[in-house]
A protein has these predicted regions:
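Rossmann-like NAD(P) dinucleotide-binding subdomain of oxidoreductase/dehydrogenase enzymes
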Residues: 160-302, 426
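Conserved C-terminal structural/oligomerization subdomain of aldehyde/semialdehyde dehydrogenase
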Residues: 66-72, 256, 293, 347, ...
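ALDH superfamily catalytic-core signature
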Residues: 266-406, 430, 469
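Glycine-rich loop-to-alpha-helix module at the N-terminal edge of alpha/beta enzyme cores
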Residues: 68-158
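Hydrophobic face of amphipathic alpha-helices that form TPR/SEL1-like repeat modules
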Residues: 20-21, 26-65
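Short, well-ordered beta-strand elements within core beta-sheets of diverse protein domains
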Residues: 70-76, 91-97, 184, 292-295, ...
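Residue-level signal for inorganic ion chemistry
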Residues: 67, 103, 125, 148, ...
Length: 512
């Protein structure tokens, strides 16, 4: 039997046939390459270089945009973590004795290098998180560079009690010293910026670091460590990869003088317990459930505009997100109408979408958590808009507004970490204060009013580490960030954040 391809081929010119055959060979080669091309495997960054894991356990990194795996990451072993801490301990002998000006110069060089390598960092982080590239550039790269430069300056500004003779013939002075080696764990919502919040004050104070990034978003942190290598002694900044078991190895190790985590309340409790077993200092920045209190005299249009941005930015995956709105009954209806309209107009999209406000949720576990909250919604609650996974590939969730919830309901009391905003009524100022404070969290809050006295009263009464007035979510390197209650303790950013990574020593000398 004569094949159809033979009949087709005989009707073509020699050149046409050659082009077709070449194209078929190209396609076969491309398919073959796709099949056999190995998936990239990440390595730890220890002692100034990439190091293969000593273990055999690996897991897939999965794109939040497509749901497909694209790389493999090792799960750090005891030996890996021991090596990282040994390197950090050795590096501290050099870095811990460096001058403040030397630390400043190293950090300034790192900031410049991060700025120059912005595109590489954006690509690596977007691949891990699905975040919008234009917002990584404006909200993480630029901010991280600024924060590194701030702590470079802080390295040279050490404060303490004045040297004096507080006892007769005795002179007392105060030394502010680095702690030593610090163990750190960072989350997946802002991988680069959270790593900078940890390492910049630690390095500025003269400490060395072993850091474990989130298991789903390690690449921008690895690249940050690589970029830092030329400016610091080998072993100053080490990165070990892995899941919660690797994090447990980092925070329970006997070497660090302090352990620091940004993460969930559950993770923070585990870290605090591990640290307590070794009497290790702990620094915890944990979850939040920020109340947004809207009084009758507030600028409702401005409030809606900012709440939508602060509530849905990064798909609501922010501990300070404007997720729990309390509105005076007199403006409740108009506020809800405008908020729902703004939510419906909010655009989400893939990393290249420059018009979108947010991308997908970071991982399938987080998607299941958010959908689980909606599945358990009580009958008296109402979904005004959204409330479901978007009809597309990846872990996208629609912008959601929910009303009718009662104070004791799960969605009022528990951090959702998704693009979900709840709205409640309040009757009086005292009612607003009581409802705002009636959660286990204490990280951030905001008050919306034109009454200056009321704003000051609320800033005093609200039991949260940050109180914004007529805005929500901006942060600056010069001001502290940290919470109360189950949101943890210790401060990031500012001179207070720098002090977290130092210790105070009293030196008294006889004048005889």
């Amino acid at each position: 039997m004569i094949s159809l391809f033979y009949i087709f081929a005989t009707s073509l010119t020699k050149m046409q046939l050659l082009n077709i055959l070449n194209h078929r060979l190209y396609l076969m080669h491309s398919i073959h390459r796709r099949v056999i091309m190995p998936v990239p495997t990440l390595k730890h960054f220890i002692n100034g270089q990439y190091i293969e894991s000593k273990g055999s356990e690996y897991f897939d990194l999965v794109s939040p945009v497509t749901g497909e795996s694209y790389a493999r990451s090792p799960n750090a072993t005891v030996a890996d973590v021991d090596d990282a801490y040994a390197s950090a301990k050795e590096a501290f002998k050099i870095w811990g004795r460096s001058t403040p000006s030397a630390r400043q110069q190293a950090l300034l060089a790192l900031a410049d290098t991060v700025e120059k390598n912005a595109e590489r960092l954006i690509e690596s982080q977007s691949r891990n998180t699905g975040q919008l590239k234009h917002l990584i550039a404006s909200e993480e790269i630029a901010t991280s560079v600024d924060h590194i430069r701030f702590f470079a300056g802080a390295a040279r500004f050490l404060e303490g009690k004045a040297t004096a003779e507080y006892l007769s013939d005795m002179t007392s002075s105060i030394r502010r010293e680095p702690l030593g080696v610090v163990g750190q764990v960072t989350p997946w919502n802002y991988p680069l910026m959270m790593a900078v919040w940890k390492i910049a004050p630690a390095l500025a104070a003269g400490n060395t670091v072993v850091l474990k990034p989130s298991d789903t978003t390690p690449e921008s942190t690895l690249l940050l460590a690589e970029l830092s290598a030329p400016f610091f002694p080998a072993g100053t900044f080490n990165v070990v990869l892995g899941n919660a078991s690797a994090g447990s190895l980092v925070v329970s190790h006997k070497t660090p003088a302090m352990v620091s985590i940004t993460g969930s309340v559950r993770a923070g409790l585990q870290v605090a317990s591990s640290a307590a077993a070794n009497l290790t200092r702990a620094h915890l920045e944990l979850g939040g459930k920020a109340p947004v209190v809207i009084f009758a005299d507030a600028d409702v249009d401005k409030a809606v505009e900012i709440i939508v941005t602060a509530g849905y930015f990064n798909a609501g995956q922010d501990c300070t997100a404007a997720s729990r709105v309390l509105v005076h009954e007199s403006v409740y209806d108009i506020f809800v109408t405008k908020l729902v309209a703004a939510a419906k107009a909010t655009r989400f999209g893939d990393p290249e979408d420059k018009e979108a406000l947010y991308g997908p949720l970071n991982n399938v576990r987080q998607l299941e958590q958010v959908t689980g909250f909606l599945a358990r919604l009580p009958a008296h609650a109402r979904i005004e808009t959204g409330g479901r996974q978007a009809d597309r590939s990846g872990y996208y969730f629609e912008p959601t507004v929910i009303t009718g919830l009662e104070q004791e309901d799960e969605m009022i009391q528990t951090e959702i970490f998704g693009p979900v905003i709840t709205v409640q009524k309040f009757l009086t100022e005292q009612d607003a204060i009581e409802k705002a404070n009636d959660v286990k969290y204490g990280l951030a809050s905001s008050v919306w009013t034109r009454d200056h006295g009321r704003a000051l009263r609320l800033s005093r009464e609200l039991d949260f580490g940050t109180v914004w007035i007529n805005t929500h979510i901006p942060l600056t390197a010069e001001a502290p960030h940290g919470g109360f209650k189950n949101s943890g303790y210790g401060k990031d950013l500012s001179a207070y954040g720098f002090d977290e990574y130092t210790r105070i020593k009293h030196v008294m000398s006889s004048n005889d």
